[in-house]
Amino acid sequence: MQATAEGMVQIETKMQIDNLKITIASGKGGTGKTTISTNLTSYLASKAQEVVLCDLDVEEPNSALFIKSSLKNEQICNKMVPKWESEECILCGECAKVCNFNAIVALPSEILVFPELCHSCYACSELCPTNSLPMNPQKIGEIKEYQAQNFSFIEGRLDLGQEMAVPMISQTIEYVEKNFKDCIKIFDAPPGTSCPVIEASRESDFAILITEATPFGLNDLKLAVETMRVLKQKFGVIINRYGIGDDSVEIYCKNEDIPIITKIKNDKEVAKLYSKGELIYPKIEHFKSSLDEIISFIGDING
């Protein structure tokens, strides 16, 4: 009977969280975002859930450090930038006037294009009266698909020297949406609350905000909460390394009516496993219990 009951719980959970898009974010780096992302993905896969992990911290992706996998596919990512063709240009300066990002400067004798500032909006190219600014692809990074033991792992990685993460994140999400339609999608977002985080979160069904019970943790959590509310995103909070600080985060969440999904206690053994690049839930029981609480919570709010 016990095995049957457990099976019923597992089937119910599969029905409730299948096809969900979950973003795991934080107001700052180092709170445990990637630790939760990698362990939650692997744990779901061990329960026969169809799941894919996508590392969207494209400037410094590190989920691969904790996942044993083999490369299955790779794809070059480009963004479109204008290239000045001088032959027909009348140097009217209209291109520089319409660019909101100062990516184009009109000089008396030439047009300068700064690709690192270009947002690929096509305004300069479309409004040029002599068609002297055709758009051309410029490589910005690569998407790599890996196969782990029982789940797929996608990594977006921005090339060195590239300054705009949003196009890379957008194309990585598109790759996942196209190739992994019928499964749970877990997005490991960049840290912070700027444009890359918004791009990683805005189409998700639910966001998990990772924080810690310290003054810095609370400050950055408030910024992350404000961001999610602007996006009108459903979200909950996980307090990681619970026990190292005070109760200010809990008081804040209570006052703001923010659900605390689970509290993961501070544990030296967790830190040791992390430093070795190992998954934690197979060896730390209380950590696995926290993952169960996450799965149960998401199933409840989606049910």
Model-derived segments and their meaning:
Residues 16-45:
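Walker A (P-loop) phosphate-binding motif
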Residues 94-112, 123-139:
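Iron-sulfur cluster-binding cysteine motifs and their immediate structural context
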Residues 40-44, 68-91, 102-120, 150:
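Ferredoxin-like iron-sulfur electron-transfer modules
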Residues 49-63, 137-141:
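Short beta-strand-centered segment that lines the nucleotide-binding/catalytic pocket of NTP-utilizing
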Residues 157-164:
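Flexible beta-alpha connector loops of hexameric P-loop NTPases
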